[in-house]
Amino acid sequence: LFCLLWVTVLTLSFAVPVLADLSHRKTNLEVVIKDHAGQPLPDAFLTLKMKRHAFRFGTQIRDHLVAISEEEFQVLSAREKQALMDPATEELGLAAHTPSWQDAERYREVLWNNFNHAIPTNGMQWIQYNNRGPEIVDKVVNLLKTKQFTVKGHSVVWPRDRWPTPDQFRSSVNQINPSIFYHQLLSDRLQDSGILGRFSDLGVGPAITDWDVLNEPMNNSYYADVFVDAGFYSSNTETFADFFKRAKGVRPDATLSINEYGILNAPNDNNARAYRDFTADLLAAGAPIDVIGVQAHMSRGNVDKASMLRRINILAETGLDIEITEFDTRDDA
């Protein structure tokens, strides 16, 4: 009895501040039932059922794993099946898992039952999209839409000196032609002819109105470095701001985001302040940014609730909407 009472007291002491923190997410709802003549029915019995959350519960998905049919799956080699899964297992030194068709079905079941928003992980990335085309992306986006999901395009520009930048534009190539690099980027990613135009109401693909335009720019300045050195821009800020301007020119209807990692789960607030200032500089340069995105790859004990809230409030100083874009937890978290 003592143990039960102690647990109850502990639970209540924890619940009170948590519920208080969530008070801004609640409101009173008044429902008036009327008859066909518009007269109130005071004794009416009403049953309400939520059909859809207004809040977007989102997750990144393995595009091909969601889109593939059983017939297509069964003819894959073991290595090809492994490639459908998260490659991070190998990065963590774990043995690659070879999924069964039942695994694929369970993956989808968890997706349909727990989320209403999804971000295809790889299919829209520059090199992946160029090499494999839009077939898988079209299929998965259309499937998500039939399930009443909203979809975010990820990502228009990820300015890394490695994947997903096409091989011929990486610094490991002896002779990079900055002009070809620049104009190919614009054509493929930031013009009507590119990915933004294709996945629009005027394009041939399913329309996507929410895009990560610039992914991880604080940690990847490779494109800006090349283009500034070539004289196309005067600074990295001007470069990245122009990417947003071009994206908005192609898709004035779209919500455009910047996205960065190492903010909420950093050892201190310095990254949050740097991200705030980085984004503010882009806004001052005329970048039409709508959302500041924050990845949240969490592991055990690396941040507490107060620190996360403080960092979110730092980002709120930009005046932009804030979105947690890539939340996940390690198995040991």
What are these regions (language model features)?
Residues 67-88, 95-112, 183-195, 270-282:
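Short, acidic/polar
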Residues 83, 94, 99-125, 143, ...:
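Catalytic domains of carbohydrate-active enzymes, especially glycoside hydrolases
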Residues 31, 118, 211, 292:
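Conserved, mostly hydrophobic/aromatic
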Residues 162-164, 255-266, 294-300, 315-333:
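Active-site clefts of carbohydrate-active enzymes
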Residues 63-64, 121-128, 149-170, 215-219:
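Aromatic-lined carbohydrate-binding surfaces of glycoside hydrolases
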